[in-house]
Regions:
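Accessory RNA-recognition modules of RNA-modification enzymes
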Residues: 1-178
């Protein structure tokens, strides 16, 4: 919700801005729920902020999760902005931080972006999945629109695609295939 805690899930009905965490959603695969839970817990623990669409501040924008039904292969892509300086919170966010100091915890993440992403990757790989984790990606997106635009992707683990089989055909699926 507006200026609320970090949330990861779906847009609240009738709201373009509010996100509701859907940790127990039964219409998605169990592996999706586990990835969402691990990601949310990790970034909350690190005090990393979500991207605020109107202020253009914050770091986390989108989490893409793809899983092949037939092969069970899983691809995860974290989409972030590059507008946050590391270590910790700096740059454009300082004015916002100073005005909301009571809401900022003292133990904000003080490492580099690489260290932050390595920690997230390790947390994801430590979890147990029914499927097979084939790739963990980090995509940068500074587009002001609320769309996932690829302005550069790094492979943190594995590969940047997975395979799915359908009617005897094999398809190579990337984060931006659909």
């Amino acid at each position: 919700f507006k200026d609320g805690p970090l949330a990861l899930g779906m847009h609240k009905r009738g709201s373009f801005y509010d996100i509701v965490t859907v940790e127990n959603c039964q219409i998605v695969d169990e592996d999706f729920r586990k990835i969402l839970s691990v990601t949310l817990a990790y970034f909350r623990e690190q005090n990393i902020t979500y991207y605020h669409k109107l202020r253009h501040t914050g770091y986390l924008r989108h989490l893409l999760v793809r899983k092949a039904v037939k092969t069970g292969e899983i691809l995860v892509d974290l989409v972030t902005t590059t507008q946050t300086d590391f270590p910790g919170i700096a740059g454009a966010q300082m004015d916002e931080v100073e005005s909301t100091l009571n809401n900022v915890q003292e133990n904000a993440f003080a490492g580099t972006e690489e260290e932050l992403l390595e920690g997230w990757k390790a947390a994801l790989l430590a979890a147990d999945y029914k499927g097979i984790m084939t790739g963990i990606l980090h995509t940068r997106n500074d587009n002001v629109a609320d769309t996932v635009t690829n302005e550069g992707t790094d492979v943190l683990y594995g590969q940047d695609f997975f395979y799915e089989e359908l009617l005897g055909l094999r398809f190579k699926i990337t984060p931006f295939s659909f």
